[in-house]
Amino acid sequence: MDKLTKKGLDGTQLKTIALVQMVLDHIHYFFEFTGCIPTVFSMLGRLSAPLFLFCTVEGFAHTHDRKRYFIRIWAIGTAMAALEFFMIYAKAFRRGDGFYPLNAIFQDLMLLCIVWQGIDWLREKKFAKGIGAIAAVLCWPYVVVVFLLLFPQVQEMPIASTVVAFVITSPLPMWSSITDGGWSFLLGGVLLYALRGRRKVQLTVWALVIFLCDFVLPFGMACRQAGFVWTQMFTDYYEWFGVAAVLLMLLYNGQRGSGHKQLFYWFYPAHVYLLYGASCLLYNVLR
């Protein structure tokens, strides 16, 4: 039995694979303006977010301190979103061409942690808490809209409108406006957690839903565009390549691995801003 559980890939190995793919993707993201970075970097990078999502599902399910787990993800996501907000509204620290990073995957994960906890409360028949947690995430955008409709003068007050914009961008983000991942990523995260424990069903449903969201729906919309050819689904609309991550997920052996958990948390913001800073310097040299 021990030999069987040791076969495949553990959590650390999956995260390492995802990390390498993420770096390739972000090299393309930040240095695409040079025209020297192959698109295949971005294509390979499509697998990184699903793998990190899968690992986060497992991490949340196994952690002994969910509150600390959540706060760590929330804090990193909030800090990165606050800097993004500053870049958007103060137009500070932007690259010479106006570009600034829109990397907010930790905010997606933060919202998902709340929903996952809600799912567990429902399983424990704590219906009020479970429904409340899930409803808080789902209904928050509508609460904001209702608030702005009831108090339209807020949008005409510079300070008040800025505060509201900051709140819904950084500490209390809305699932409908996060700049990274998108609704299909969030839906995939809910499915992975809700179906956890039935690996084949879990990954089959996830792969089918993501294929529908990232291939079938974009293909249907792209077909309406003049000049579109189906091969563009492999050259331009390749977000659906992330479905291939299911093959690596199937190899997960249920083991956490050797650790390095702090590395994976802090590497994300560190490499984003290092690559962004390098791209700003290179842009200034080349312009």
Where are the regions that the model predicts?
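Alpha-helical transmembrane segments and their immediate juxtamembrane cytosolic regions
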Residues: M1-R287
